[in-house]
Curated annotation (Swiss-Prot):
InterPro entries: AcCoA_carboxyl_beta (IPR034733), Acetyl_CoA_COase_Trfase_b_su (IPR000438), ClpP/crotonase-like_dom_sf (IPR029045), COA_CT_N (IPR011762), Znf-ACC (IPR041010). It comes from Roseiflexus sp. (strain RS-1). Keywords: ATP-binding, Cytoplasm, Fatty acid biosynthesis, Fatty acid metabolism, Lipid biosynthesis, Lipid metabolism, Metal-binding, Nucleotide-binding, Transferase, Zinc, Zinc-finger. The gene is accD1. GO terms for biological process: fatty acid biosynthetic process; malonyl-CoA biosynthetic process. Acetyl-CoA carboxylase is a heterohexamer composed of biotin carboxyl carrier protein (AccB), biotin carboxylase (AccC) and two subunits each of ACCase subunit alpha (AccA) and ACCase subunit beta (AccD). It holds the Pfam family Carboxyl_trans. The keyword Lipid metabolism applies. Component of the acetyl coenzyme A carboxylase (ACC) complex. Biotin carboxylase (BC) catalyzes the carboxylation of biotin on its carrier protein (BCCP) and then the CO(2) group is transferred by the transcarboxylase to acetyl-CoA to form malonyl-CoA. Zn(2+) binds at C30, C33, C49, C51. This is Acetyl-coenzyme A carboxylase carboxyl transferase subunit beta 1. Pathway: Lipid metabolism; malonyl-CoA biosynthesis; malonyl-CoA from acetyl-CoA: step 1/1. It comes from the Bacteria. It catalyses: N(6)-carboxybiotinyl-L-lysyl-[protein] + acetyl-CoA = N(6)-biotinyl-L-lysyl-[protein] + malonyl-CoA.
């Protein structure tokens, strides 16, 4: 998937078939319009349907934004533990951690790294939604705080890619305190004169939105991404009113001044390159620029 974001999106044909079983690995059915799309064409189009629906990418697929050979991962072994011995009628947290690690091949829901986009160095944090809903627990928060500290020390911008259900309920207060810890680390990044660019992808909710993503210098969202604190159904049940059809979508947030831009996936790498270049050039004219270390990448 390393070339995912370097391919020119292609036009593709789709067949509208209702309630038909889909052979494994041959076709993808769009959850939005119901069209069947040939898998290879769907991948060539960055997993975006012709109707505009953006299918969720894995954390590893998002790493395709980076230049070839620039990815250097941090803290891959850092993992959450079941400190509270959490058990609910639906699941045992310790077993859920084991299953998520087997399913995703990751130790937790966040990958952190250094890398480059069009030759411009940066630090990156990207969530894996398939790992317990991309929820922020103690290991997630620690990984994120560490990569922010690395970015501040190395005078590098930070890009976060966020698809999350929020703080991890199985870790209780241990998860909630990560919100404050991460935002404190971001004050160091700001003091170093470096930007935090947050990309919100579907879905982005709860403590992840309420902490570090909502205070980013630039907030970008993919088209149609659902973004909010509490879910739509919870709000409707609480206020006993129907919400607008497009409530909590990226477009709704843009119209109400909550985010800076809505960017299709095919344009994302170019937009990020432009933003990184603007911030780099602005930083070069500050007095802090003389303290920037000469790096090829951030050391782990």
């Amino acid at each position: 998937m390393k070339d995912l974001f370097r391919r020119a999106p292609k036009r593709f044909t789709a067949a509208r078939i209702e309630n038909q079983a889909i052979p494994d690995n041959m076709w993808v059915k769009c959850p939005s319009c119901g069209d069947l799309i040939y898998t290879r064409q769907f991948s060539d189009n960055l997993k975006v349907c012709k109707c505009g629906y953006h299918m969720r990418l894995t954390a590893r697929e998002w790493l395709g934004l980076l230049d070839d050979g620039s990815f250097v991962e941090f803290d891959a072994a850092l993992a959450s533990v079941d400190a509270l011995g959490f058990v609910s009628p639906r699941h045992v947290y310790e077993q859920k951690l084991i299953e998520s690690r087997q399913q995703t091949g990751l130790n937790d829901a966040l990958i952190t790294s250094s890398g480059a986009i069009n030759g411009m160095l940066l630090c990156l944090a990207v969530t894996e939604f398939e790992f317990i809903g991309g929820s922020m627990g103690s290991a997630y928060g620690e990984r994120l705080a560490r990569v922010i500290e690395r970015a501040a020390d190395a005078r590098l911008p930070l890009l976060t890619i966020n698809a999350s259900g929020g703080a991890r309920q199985e870790e209780g207060t241990l998860a909630l305190l990560q919100m404050a810890k991460v935002n404190m680390a971001l004050t160091r990044l700001a003091a170093a004169g470096q930007p935090h660019i947050a990309l919100l992808v579907d879905p982005c909710y709860g403590g992840v939105l309420a902490s570090y993503t909502s205070v980013a210098d630039v907030i970008i969202a993919e088209p149609g991404a659902r973004v909010g604190f509490a879910g739509r159904r919870v709000i409707e049940q609480t206020i006993r009113q129907k919400l607008p059809v497009h409530f909590q979508t990226a477009e709704f947030l843009l119209d109400h001044g909550m985010i800076d831009m809505v960017t299709p996936r095919s344009e994302l790498r170019g937009v990020l390159s432009t933003l990184l270049r603007l911030y780099r050039d602005a930083f070069a004219h500050t007095s802090a620029a003389q303290h920037v270390p000469a790096l090829t990448h951030v050391q782990g």
